[in-house]
Each structure stands twice: as structure tokens, then as C-alpha cells.
Amino acid sequence: MSKTVVRKNESLDDALRRFKRSVTKAGTLQESRKREFYEKPSVKRKRKSEAARKRKKF
């Protein structure tokens, strides 16, 4: 979990920007979206192989 402490004389906008950056860097939002719904193992494998195929293409 990302935690941001507001520094002395720091605006709320700056603290929010730092928090958003830390959440993005940690991948918290992507992880929660990925786990929002159950994904069958066969669908996971298919998605993973398609992503590998896309990466290989370029």
C-alpha cells in the first residue's frame, strides 16, 4: 500500500501528485483492475501468449 505524508509547507496538490506517482510506480491500480473479476486459467494463458506474440512482432 502506498503511503504519502504531507510535508511541511507542501500544497495538497503536490502531495496528491506524489501519491499518484507512487501508486503508479507500485502498480497498485493495475493489480486491482486485473483482480477485479476472476479470470479462468485458460483465458490467462491465452492472453499471455497473445501479449508475447505482440511483443515478438515488433
From Swiss-Prot:
State the Gene Ontology BP annotations: translation
Q: Name one GO molecular function term.
A: structural constituent of ribosome
Q: Which UniProt keywords apply?
A: Ribonucleoprotein, Ribosomal protein
Q: Where is this region: Disordered?
A: 36-58
Pfam family, any one: Ribosomal_S21
This protein's source sits in the domain of life called Bacteria
Q: Which family does it belong to?
A: Belongs to the bacterial ribosomal protein bS21 family.
Protein name in UniProt: Small ribosomal subunit protein bS21
Which gene holds the coding sequence for this protein? rpsU
